[in-house]
């Protein structure tokens, strides 16, 4: 398959923001693929492989600038000036390639397979001479493709493809191309347990629909963790679950999957990023704690004070994430306990279709508690007084609140789903929203006065699952320390966009557009009708959306969440309705 077909499709996609049109373009492109299909899907995602494999080309913008200088015979300083002007390394590559007419006359057209193989070679090269090898590989691609080809290849290399589609839209296109919409829910469930779009596309094209639908948890392949709905009172939760419920501590840590096969242990975050190397103490302890041939566990990794046993908040664990050096020292200074609350696979058996009560029983009999692994504290009760007392104890112990788990016969583990089988109950903030929300940054406003030289406020958005877009819901300017405030431009630098990102829906024009990448936790006073924000626009009131009044940053950057994991538009709608219901009850 010629890469020019991919380039043509990407060019068409850049001219629309309508999800149906984007999907149609992708369907046509996918159907054009042959043995290149798996590689094609990864390139459409802007990746080389599924996230959990952690494969990256390791080529920075600076290295691309050096390579462009070599292939074009233009001084690096001049290439850097073009980069400063355009702000996008892909556009720089296109402009330079067009000016210098670099394409070799002897090279054949690029193919999808050749591009993917070359990028994989870039990613896997190591040792002395690896930088030169990557530059040489890039030069080869630059000489073989058109300026437009090079622009998109460069964006893929640097992880900045940004063609306006998410994995959800790509999955829709795969289903339409190789299956039938009536199986969408089952295929999406399979993807949630096996988040590899390239693999799923190939299986569906081969006609292996049944094997895809039957996909469950697989050791060493991370899944999308099950999520909880929210309610604001014990009575509501007990009523919703018909009195058949357990309540577990909701720990303030990092959601962690633990996969063990024989003596091999791998850890994954809720975003399917492998974190094994950052927690050598947990890996070592897991080998000593769990005596099974294979198991997959779900829990929360929480840092604690080794002298007092006091639980530290989520932010402290960030000192362990992404670290490569002095891990043993940090492990002693900031030890971790993983509080386990679920098991989805053991010794070759899929437990995802086993009711929660039985999964918990299996988990309780699996291991002996130690400093690194403990069971999430829980009670089984429908008595409001008992549950309220347990809730207060959870807050006293440094937790966020409780998670209610259904004890019904159909309380299965639903990967990636947010449903009423799990319901979270968090601290009731008086005169505030009764839960924190996680929003994606899509823009920034320059500061004035004391905030001159940095961003004074950020434009935040919810995620609209139906439209695969981000809808603005508030401007955030409160809750920042001075250190955090003045570090904002640096934090967002690589995500700045010259134009409004395709998936952002906004009537507000910020000073700086930011590509949806970073999620932050906020609290606010209430949800109100807004004539300017686009969250739920036209749903509650005609020509109006919803917004968060008096938003305040809690200090928690949700590095464990992808933008698509942020609070959804539908959740804001439900919170608004619940808020109105509560106010009505108080007045009566």
UniProtKB/Swiss-Prot annotation:
<dbReference type="InterPro" id="IPR000977">
    <property type="entry name" value="DNA_ligase_ATP-dep"/>
</dbReference>
<feature type="binding site">
    <location>
        <position position="424"/>
    </location>
    <ligand>
        <name>ATP</name>
    </ligand>
</feature>
<dbReference type="GO" id="GO:0003910">
    <property type="term" value="F:DNA ligase (ATP) activity"/>
</dbReference>
<dbReference type="InterPro" id="IPR012310">
    <property type="entry name" value="DNA_ligase_ATP-dep_cent"/>
</dbReference>
<keyword id="KW-0235">DNA replication</keyword>
<dbReference type="InterPro" id="IPR016059">
    <property type="entry name" value="DNA_ligase_ATP-dep_CS"/>
</dbReference>
<comment type="similarity">
    <text>Belongs to the ATP-dependent DNA ligase family.</text>
</comment>
<keyword id="KW-0067">ATP-binding</keyword>
<feature type="active site" description="N6-AMP-lysine intermediate">
    <location>
        <position position="250"/>
    </location>
</feature>
<dbReference type="GO" id="GO:0051301">
    <property type="term" value="P:cell division"/>
</dbReference>
<keyword id="KW-0547">Nucleotide-binding</keyword>
<dbReference type="InterPro" id="IPR036599">
    <property type="entry name" value="DNA_ligase_N_sf"/>
</dbReference>
<dbReference type="Pfam" id="PF04679">
    <property type="entry name" value="DNA_ligase_A_C"/>
</dbReference>
<dbReference type="GO" id="GO:0046872">
    <property type="term" value="F:metal ion binding"/>
</dbReference>
<dbReference type="InterPro" id="IPR050191">
    <property type="entry name" value="ATP-dep_DNA_ligase"/>
</dbReference>
<keyword id="KW-0227">DNA damage</keyword>
<feature type="binding site">
    <location>
        <position position="300"/>
    </location>
    <ligand>
        <name>ATP</name>
    </ligand>
</feature>
<dbReference type="Pfam" id="PF01068">
    <property type="entry name" value="DNA_ligase_A_M"/>
</dbReference>
<dbReference type="InterPro" id="IPR022865">
    <property type="entry name" value="DNA_ligae_ATP-dep_bac/arc"/>
</dbReference>
<protein>
    <recommendedName>
        <fullName>DNA ligase</fullName>
        <ecNumber>6.5.1.1</ecNumber>
    </recommendedName>
</protein>
<dbReference type="GO" id="GO:0006310">
    <property type="term" value="P:DNA recombination"/>
</dbReference>
<dbReference type="GO" id="GO:0006281">
    <property type="term" value="P:DNA repair"/>
</dbReference>
<dbReference type="GO" id="GO:0003677">
    <property type="term" value="F:DNA binding"/>
</dbReference>
<comment type="function">
    <text>DNA ligase that seals nicks in double-stranded DNA during DNA replication, DNA recombination and DNA repair.</text>
</comment>
<keyword id="KW-0436">Ligase</keyword>
<dbReference type="GO" id="GO:0071897">
    <property type="term" value="P:DNA biosynthetic process"/>
</dbReference>
<feature type="binding site">
    <location>
        <position position="341"/>
    </location>
    <ligand>
        <name>ATP</name>
    </ligand>
</feature>
<dbReference type="InterPro" id="IPR012308">
    <property type="entry name" value="DNA_ligase_ATP-dep_N"/>
</dbReference>
<keyword id="KW-0131">Cell cycle</keyword>
<feature type="binding site">
    <location>
        <position position="248"/>
    </location>
    <ligand>
        <name>ATP</name>
    </ligand>
</feature>
<feature type="binding site">
    <location>
        <position position="255"/>
    </location>
    <ligand>
        <name>ATP</name>
    </ligand>
</feature>
<keyword id="KW-0233">DNA recombination</keyword>
<dbReference type="InterPro" id="IPR012340">
    <property type="entry name" value="NA-bd_OB-fold"/>
</dbReference>
<dbReference type="GO" id="GO:0005524">
    <property type="term" value="F:ATP binding"/>
</dbReference>
<keyword id="KW-0234">DNA repair</keyword>
<feature type="binding site">
    <location>
        <position position="270"/>
    </location>
    <ligand>
        <name>ATP</name>
    </ligand>
</feature>
<feature type="binding site">
    <location>
        <position position="418"/>
    </location>
    <ligand>
        <name>ATP</name>
    </ligand>
</feature>
<keyword id="KW-0460">Magnesium</keyword>
<keyword id="KW-0132">Cell division</keyword>
<dbReference type="Pfam" id="PF04675">
    <property type="entry name" value="DNA_ligase_A_N"/>
</dbReference>
<dbReference type="InterPro" id="IPR012309">
    <property type="entry name" value="DNA_ligase_ATP-dep_C"/>
</dbReference>
<dbReference type="GO" id="GO:0006273">
    <property type="term" value="P:lagging strand elongation"/>
</dbReference>
